[in-house]
């Protein structure tokens, strides 16, 4: 394999200046998703986007299955009687609920699920008898519905979240449930690592935790315009739901005890983050393991007399790669030029492109172009399979490396309000000294003009031995670093 030339990759100027406009352009032109459906916050997955989504879903399923989770499917309808049982939960979600306003004569009040804790608990109560039935680990990938009042954005803020993976686990003790919380964090790290996403892990402040949770841990990523996007959440629910639904088990000592529960969710926001993080002014680059098409072949011939020879060689290349499991496509359209095809497949994020022309056939080689860097390589047919596998691995590693470098460059510690404001304006995520007091935290948000992501869980969150003051409440000693950002 010989590097023919280094190329100048696309810039990210459009993403930095108007990310949402760029994202709409990508979804439309790459034929991933259609935003023209006439219901606010509800959109259509197109075939190419659906193939990408299925690959992500399969990744999620594989990792959950490997860690002892079992897939289920619950109804979309939840009786309001169930939904209203947990007081914090209903306060957190009631304004976002879609009601079933007409369903025949009479009948109970129903809602479309915004999340499934209150649907699952009544059934879990029937399934669990004693300690031998625990732990129970369930998950489903379904649509959930939330009547968003804020501006909706494709994949990012929706009324129908159509790829909502929610896991629900039930445990005998708090210790076992919190062990599951730690495992859930590791599960999400594995998923996001395979999506080549960089992430912060933050313990949400009390005023922003999941309704009904004792605490919430969130995964946030930083997008090119400096705003953060929440891509996954993990909730320790304690006995808040099992108490109101009377989910108990017979312990080994013969007494009945309340079970402890967790839940954790991920949605198509993760796909949005992947498309945007690896995006540029020419389109996006898909991680090779998840790309619907990993390699595209573009035949290049001049005149009808060259076509049979070129296509015969192309077919040989195609079979060679297909037979080792590589997802490959031949773009043999006659009404498009090779240059047009190059831009088209770069837009759609195909990781590798193979060009085959008459001179390549004479040398028994092909030209392979990486989407992430646009570098071109001459590869002999004899080394093609190994070279393609190697290049896909290199592309994946580079996407991951670039994402983490960008995230680390955008994280800054500051000790003054004005410095925090300036850093936020520059597209940074700031860490500021905080006492841990909720009122001071809310005031901090207002002073800086940004949202609190929470206390870092991927680094040491403590101030340590330094005598720092809470930026919003100077009379209080700071105990933690609090992350703040603008966010979607």
From Swiss-Prot:
GO terms for cellular component: aminoacyl-tRNA synthetase multienzyme complex; cytoplasm. This is Proline--tRNA ligase. It catalyses: tRNA(Pro) + L-proline + ATP = L-prolyl-tRNA(Pro) + AMP + diphosphate. Consists of three domains: the N-terminal catalytic domain, the anticodon-binding domain and the C-terminal extension. It comes from Pyrobaculum islandicum (strain DSM 4184 / JCM 9189 / GEO3). It comes from the Archaea. Homodimer. Keywords: Aminoacyl-tRNA synthetase, ATP-binding, Cytoplasm, Ligase, Nucleotide-binding, Protein biosynthesis. InterPro entries: aa-tRNA-synt_IIb, aa-tRNA-synth_II, aa-tRNA-synth_II/BPL/LPL, Anticodon-bd, Anticodon-bd_dom_sf, Pro-tRNA-ligase_IIa, Pro-tRNA-ligase_IIa_arc-type, Pro-tRNA_ligase_II_C. GO terms for molecular function: ATP binding; proline-tRNA ligase activity. Its EC number is 6.1.1.15. Belongs to the class-II aminoacyl-tRNA synthetase family. ProS type 3 subfamily. PROSITE patterns: AA_TRNA_LIGASE_II. Catalyzes the attachment of proline to tRNA(Pro) in a two-step reaction: proline is first activated by ATP to form Pro-AMP and then transferred to the acceptor end of tRNA(Pro). The lineage of its organism: Archaea, Thermoproteota, Thermoprotei, Thermoproteales, Thermoproteaceae.
